Amino acid sequence: MAEKFHRATFTRNFLKTITRIKNPDEMLAEAKAEGLEKTLGVFDLIILGVGAIIGSGIFAVVGIAAAGSADGSSLGAGPALVISMIIAAFACIFSALCYSEFATMIPVAGGAYTYTFATLGEFAAWMVGWVLMLEYAIGFIAVACAWSNHFVQFLSGFEHVLPAWLAHPPVWLVNDAFSAAKIVADNPSVHIPTLFGMPICINLPAILIVLLITMILVKGTKDSTKMAGVMVFIKLAVIALFVVAGAFFVRPENWTPFAPHGAAGIFAGAFLIFFAYIGFDALATAAEECKNPQKDLPIGIIGSLIITTIVYVLVALVLTGLQDTSGAVPMAFLKAPMAYCMTMLKMNWAAGLISIGSLAGLTSVLLVLEMAATRILYAMSRDHFISQRFQKLHPKFHTPALLTWTVGLLAVVGILTLNLDVAAELCNYGTFTSFIIVCVAVLILRKTDPDRPRPFKVPFSPVTPALGIICCGGLMIYKSMQPSGSALLFPVWLGFGAIIYLLYGFVKNRLNENKIHIEKVEQKKQEMMK
């Protein structure tokens, strides 16, 4: 009987612990006491937002969204790509409004992780942090490799600057040693040395850009924002060049039929374009570094989405007006649609500038992704889930330098060891999960803490958060129904996160609580002795 009682008590205490909610006032007090330097204004936030959103998607994915994939697994929207972009924008705006409410109410580092801790408890917060690491850290690695691909493609117009083994992604990551050896055999002109029969190559451009971005972030968010601003200006200028130059050669007959594959093609296009909008959520992780988060963050988040949507719609109109997307299209259009169209118009110089624009776009995305990853981990360190050493700020730059370098060096390891096709698929699930959690958290905190000041409130709640949950949940279900192994790997990733929490995060938090309790007891003893 006693054993049964102790078991019930243990279970009750365990459940109480893992559902422990951290009061938002406590979060704000911690941020005020030992927070990051406040350097970001509304213009900086819009620059970071546009920099994070407009990346490789508009330069590459838009071709597949318009014409469909080469293997026929994804239908194209055709000229109705404009409608697909607006649908994707609405799907994002519901979640963006929820992020804005939280970011103004609890303007501290951590984003969705912090909001979950304030509403759903410790274990849920850990799991969201674990999922966000998948989204930001793995996304950072994947974008670095994409940057390398664009860089090598850009150099191909000149003399070979780098030997193949220093510019080729590690071929052993394809599947196995046999597949890697076959790649080398099928490409005899690409000289890649071998060691014990295994091809040896290092993606040097990806590694170097990761180290460069890390150094810039260590110097501070203000310097990072300046660089992001330059990159945003370059890519917007290149996109404007494409729109203006291409508009004179648009053939209206290419817009007929408007939706060659009907609603199915429009929604398939919206699903692909959705990922060209991802990045606005990273702004919420920088809330602690905003000068006036209550006013500036909603403008930054919503403003960057509106600007991006306008840019995307203009590109879609010109692109589908230049190329007939109702039937088969060249493979070059699917890989680099904007550059292909400029080449077909005999504007090779413009195609070269578009390549530069894609590099600039990816560079700004890298900046925001690594910054977001470090701010999530910084918040988790503050909550004693990981080592408190990562809380230490650089004495000169007031940035989490040790944490930033740790993320950067782990990214280098990931570039050499991860199968990025699978990793990128997993990132999509991480994104959907974090969006859904934030929408749910808004509804919960409206009930549990209705009197808390909300400088920005989600309009038409609870309808807006519910629509965000439905849109993201529907896209997540749609994605899981596609033939891909990542749908099975995501629950495995969550399982690993739960195990690490139980064996490390949970234990470390309890040890810290005991330490704080002992310190309080000792303090009371000293006060009594006085």
What name fits each language-model region?
Residues 42, 203-207, 291-295, 299, ...:
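Loop-to-transmembrane helix boundary motifs in multi-pass membrane proteins
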Residues 58-180, 187-188, 307, 485, ...:
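Extracellular loop-to-transmembrane helix junctions
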